[in-house]
């Protein structure tokens, strides 16, 4: 009986190994097909939400406990992710309806190009207008990127060598590791405008971050607070992570 059981196991494993595995292309096609369906459904639900609250700019954030959409104003730091996702699906599928959806949600983000009170405009604009420019060469998007980068650069302090992350809280000059994501906007705008100052700001921020955010084991702190008068490090800590001496996974990635 034991031999019979082992024989069944052997043949089960043998035939399982002979089954054709899904290729990477097939997997990618399947994932994008699913993503396209989900994003199209989200667009429909967002239209319904906008009708219910017409005075708000509607950007998807999450879901509430009752299953309804949790939406946010364009100033929310993740507002560029949805139009950015639509641009990626358009790029992969070539389906113009996703291009039109991306443009519909992207246009509400244009006022961000003149915001100087936070650092998130880097990926808010690069996800949306950055992908639009990359895929189409659109001149309006090009201008938005340059204006946005110059707004972001106003948060740079040459004594510290970084752009400031937040204007709230008990810190003096907080810089979070996530701020590295915003350097793409500075570098792209420097390339488009030949504005060397934007490139210098990006490189200085990267060098200062490399020097002060990383430990000997190459894990990183979430937040480093600086003295803007001297550039000295005041404190290294976390704000949203597990502990001050833990690694900030999102920044580490």
Language-model segments: residues:
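Glycan-recognition and catalytic cores of secretory/periplasmic carbohydrate-active enzymes
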Residues: 21-253
